């Protein structure tokens, strides 16, 4: 996501890019997808327009996500995409180059950070600062990170899930795993193929996840009609899918997140662990909207788990505040 304060802005990998302007809130939210023509290597579309092309493009047009799991997979395309979003958010009449803060997952290496920084300068930034995702998420979720007590934040994005224990404005213990929202979609695609011999696209899988996806048994199952291609006959087919099936499809991914939380709790100093048991675990990020995730984590850790008020924008807002109050938090 991407947050911006005055002409200060933060960009980060999510399945979407979010732009936050101080006083205006979120002004732009678009998927980090770029469609380009394979023959001419020219960019055809960026953002929402490109997402609509996912899985629907003629052979010569490819839709790609240049930022995968917080890491640049295609440098030139990332730079062009950032330039596009910066201009769209600020308007073309901007004379001053913005100060941009870039959010990265906690596990990103120095080399990867440098690549993100360089791409941001190339996209037109006057100044670039790099912030770790869990810190921004905690601030955005309304946690006062400057106090000497332990807070656990679990930020489930598109590409990565970041788990961190934060105290006194810094990360004490953290882990970043490459299991998140995109993996939920892929798990649903695999499940439909294996269980129903039905081939569905990424967008359909995302729809299933949003409408009936669940990580924990629901008192009453939800159902939805799903269309795809029957792998046996090769013809289109519609079937009814239940939320219980999504629970089964997502089990491996959700349990990996639970295990990563366990791992971080095991490494947490006892005083801070006691604070977390007291204060609970806070979930942020688009992936945290998966129904039943709070219950699943609470059941396996014995710690009360809640989702931040506006999990989708917590990191964007937190980054904005971080840039504003950098001095205050540092002190």
Sequence positions of predicted segments:
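Nucleotide/phosphate-binding catalytic cleft detector across ATP-hydrolyzing
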Residues: 1-2, 7-8, 12-156, 164-282, ...
């Amino acid at each position: 996501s991407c947050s911006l304060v005055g002409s200060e802005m933060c960009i980060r990998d999510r399945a979407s890019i979010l732009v936050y302007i101080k006083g205006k809130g979120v002004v732009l939210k678009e998927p980090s997808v770029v469609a380009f023509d394979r023959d001419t290597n020219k960019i055809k579309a960026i953002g929402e327009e490109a997402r609509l092309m996912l899985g629907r493009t003629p052979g010569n047009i490819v839709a790609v996500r240049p930022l995968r799991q917080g890491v640049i997979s295609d440098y030139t395309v990332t730079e062009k995409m950032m330039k596009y979003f910066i201009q769209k958010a600020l308007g073309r009449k901007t004379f001053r180059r913005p100060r941009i803060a870039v959010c990265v997952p906690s596990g990103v290496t120095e080399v990867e950070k440098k690549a993100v920084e360089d791409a941001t300068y190339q996209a037109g930034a006057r100044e670039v600062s790099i912030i770790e995702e869990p810190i921004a998420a905690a601030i955005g979720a309304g946690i006062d990170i400057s106090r000497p007590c332990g807070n656990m934040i679990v930020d489930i994005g598109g590409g990565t899930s970041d788990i961190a224990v934060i105290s006194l404005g810094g990360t004490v213990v953290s882990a970043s795993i490459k299991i998140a929202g995109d993996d939920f979609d892929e798990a649903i695609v695999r499940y439909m193929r294996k269980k129903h011999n039905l081939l569905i696209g990424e967008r359909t899988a995302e729809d299933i996840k949003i409408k009936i996806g669940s990580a924990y048994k629901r008192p009453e199952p939800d159902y939805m009609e799903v269309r795809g291609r029957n792998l046996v006959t090769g013809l289109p087919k519609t079937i009814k899918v239940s939320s219980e099936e999504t629970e089964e499809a997502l089990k491996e991914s959700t349990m990996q997140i639970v295990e990563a939380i366990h791992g971080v709790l095991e490494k947490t100093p006892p005083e801070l662990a006691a604070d977390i048991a007291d204060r609970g675990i806070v979930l942020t990020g688009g992936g945290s909207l998966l129904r039943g995730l709070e219950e699943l984590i609470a059941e396996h850790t014995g710690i009360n788990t809640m989702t931040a008020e506006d999990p989708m924008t917590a990191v964007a807002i937190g980054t904005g505040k971080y840039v504003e109050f950098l001095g205050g938090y540092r002190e």
